[in-house]
């Protein structure tokens, strides 16, 4: 699921994406610039853009040809980054975020994209799109750079809910396996449960129970459970999907992003320090550019809400145009593969099969 490659025209078809232009720290200018970048690579994409119409018209007019692929829907309010989800649920109907989700609910667009307040976006998504049958807590899944052939691992939850009991973690494993099949084209994903160590006796009680549930469900759900994994396994090729609660996952995600930025900054400083280091940088330019791209958090910008009757991609609030374009391209790929319908069917099948397997094993004990 590389953000750099353009989709073929046949794959995209008449894909329409719903874009919240007003969410995010950098405002609508960054979102519109990201739209222009994504449209340049995939010119058959169409967008429904939500926000302040006069401001959006002015920004879009500066991007050649962008107005031709955008439908604007005016909203008078914006969900701020410090807004409480409960307040937005009661008073947010006139916001760009609400309108963005509504377009997916009404079938006008296939995927929603927003850089806005994560809690508010999840709250609106849950009340307007509703949860898939059998899902207790939706999760946010992200792609994590790794040594695997695809270049990525999937990790969830990374911030939808700070709590998760054993049953929730089992559902995350089922949803993560489905995402890996559809998003990374893995026929039998390897699932790992994040813990403070790989030994079976380590970790909280709910993690040990979750490990048993996931292990029992694995044969029927057609994935491999590798057991507990720890932080050092996140970028490894030992696992394809890392399952954890939203608190731990979000801390891990932000730590990884901060570390990647630190490495880039330290490399830049090191190669600018002396004339000799500048020459070395020129000689190693191609390799350094490849490394920089590989660890750039912007190229995997976009968490996917799993477990809802609709697909929502959450971009980072601080995403620049490159990051916004990556999130839009991810949304386009999910739409082109019919991800939501396949995920819903897979979860229903996996839940049923896992339930039968667990009941059989329980009755035989």
UniProtKB/Swiss-Prot annotation:
One of its GO terms (molecular function) is phosphate:acyl-[acyl carrier protein] acyltransferase activity. Keywords: Cytoplasm, Lipid biosynthesis, Lipid metabolism, Phospholipid biosynthesis, Phospholipid metabolism, Transferase. Pathway: Lipid metabolism; phospholipid metabolism. It is found in: Cytoplasm. Its EC number is 2.3.1.274. The keyword NADP does not apply. Its main location: cytoplasm. It catalyses: a fatty acyl-[ACP] + phosphate = an acyl phosphate + holo-[ACP]. GO terms for biological process: fatty acid biosynthetic process; phospholipid biosynthetic process. It is an enzyme of class 2 (transferase). Homodimer. Probably interacts with PlsY. Belongs to the PlsX family. This is Phosphate acyltransferase. It comes from Jannaschia sp. (strain CCS1).
